[in-house]
Regions:
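Short acidic-glycine-tyrosine-enriched beta hairpin
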Residues: 74-90
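A short hydrophobic beta-strand segment most commonly corresponding to one strand
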Residues: 41, 87, 102-117
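Glycine- and acidic-residue-biased ligand/ion/polar-headgroup-sensing regions
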Residues: 57-68
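Short, surface-exposed secondary-structure edge patches
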Residues: 41, 60, 76-78
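A generic "binding-loop/recognition-motif" signal
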Residues: 48, 56-57, 76, 92-93, ...
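A short, N-terminal "cap"/entry segment at the start of jelly-roll beta-barrel domains
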Residues: 1-36, 121-125
Length: 125
């Protein structure tokens, strides 16, 4: 068994192109011995966002705090709020933006592909 408290896991800024004001706490990954899924806590400051992107891994997300907009198409945006659960299919484009006044916090899981740790995703071709 592995037990961690989220505050004991360092927040790591995501400095990839198209990301702003976002950090991740990699709670449980392949580095911890997870065989199939990684569990991550994503935090986005007010006005922050991730890029409009897709990857081969599915995403299961649960929104803990904040008000945000999910963009899944060039012209389609959906309001998301704390308590919402979301499934994004493999290679489904998406972007999360924090449109609220407080920190956005969401739990995000991704499957572990061979050779992956859960800290990164696999771009769609």
């Amino acid at each position: 068994m592995i037990l961690k408290h989220s505050e004991d896991v360092p927040a790591e800024p995501i400095n990839k192109p198209g990301f702003s004001g976002m950090q991740a706490r990699f709670l449980l990954t392949a580095d911890d011995g997870c065989p199939r899924y990684a569990l991550r806590l994503m935090e986005i400051v007010p006005g922050g966002y991730c890029s409009f992107h897709c990857h081969k891994e599915e995403h299961e997300m649960f929104f803990l705090e904040g008000e945000e907009v999910l963009k899944t198409d060039v012209s389609k945006e959906t309001q998301i709020r704390a308590g919402d659960a979301l499934l994004l299919q493999p290679c489904e484009f998406h972007q999360i933006r924090n449109t609220g006044k407080g920190m956005l916090k969401m739990i995000c899981t991704v499957p572990l592909f061979v050779g992956k740790t859960g800290r990164e995703t696999t771009p769609c071709e």
